[in-house]
Amino acid sequence: MKKMNLSVLALTAVLGATTLVATSCKREGCTDETALNFDDKAKTDDGSCEYPSTTTELIEVEGDITTTVNWTNDKQYLVKGFLRIQDGGVLNIEAGTVIFGDTQTKGTIVVQRGGMINANGTAAEPIVMTSEKAPGLRQPGDWGGLVICGNAPNNVPGGTAELEGGYGAFHGGTDPADNSGIIRYVQINFAGVPINPNEEVNSLTMGSVGSGTVIENVQCAYGLDDAFEWFGGTVNCKYLVAYRGLDDDMDVDLGYSGNVQFALCIRNASSADQSGSNGFEVDNDGQGSTNTPFTSATFSNVSLIGPKADRNVAISLQFQNAAQLRRNNKLKI
């Protein structure tokens, strides 16, 4: 009996050793196929899985741009106050980049004369400029918008003018082919800031922008003032969308003489400005003078869809005209 007990103990010891060896052969690692470090040979997950970051770095920007600056789509940008691209400065914005306007300081991008912005988005990866608030909480006028000042002619005596509001955005010169950069496949949403009564920053404000500048495939939505406004200049624009703005869809004055083709403007029944909202508002200048060059731009293939979807829809009493053409303008539609 004593000999038999020793044999049992020996067998138990051998089985135990075999179990230990088998267990130690099971490879541990990350077994989640969606992880960055997935190990297809691992049998047991050891909790080491790594995943792509869901947090995009937010960079605050303000002040002046005087050199070449690149914004990339792996980051997001918060514009605070007036961000000015000064003479000689260049801002390049990669397709797919998201830019937020600060609501407290009413962030606004201003391209000064001699500065350049290259916001070159694509249909698949548009550049989005919008309110910093969370979706569902955003409101018209949360931030300023985009302002471009060029060196093309206008009809202001002396040739140089400051954009309304007095925020130091001067425009005008003698170069019809002036180039302020590229605005392509860009969304400008929830912009427009009142500076003084009847003086606002629009979603996209263009002061004497030259024909060397590319502006196409631009959407301005939910703006507090005009969607697009041209103060003089010669820039040609294509594929513009104005959606549910408060004031005018397209405001044209101070001798703008470029060409605009393919535009769509859609109104909301209850969104109209106290000053009166129009599809087009066109003047030669604010005084109705005969200063030259006359406001003589050509608009082609434009669709204006008004606020009254059917006769039973109640609309704001502040709506005025599809096209308010007045005071010595020579616009062609």
Locate each region found by the language model.
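Calcium-binding acidic motifs and repeat modules
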Residues: 5-6, 10, 137
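Bacterial Sec-dependent N-terminal signal peptides
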Residues: 2-5, 16-57
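Intrinsic disorder/low-complexity segments
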Residues: 4, 13-15, 21, 274, ...
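Outer/extracellular conduits and scaffolds centered on Gram-negative outer-membrane beta-barrels
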Residues: 9-14, 325
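Beta-strand/loop edge motif enriched in small/polar residues
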Residues: 26, 52-333
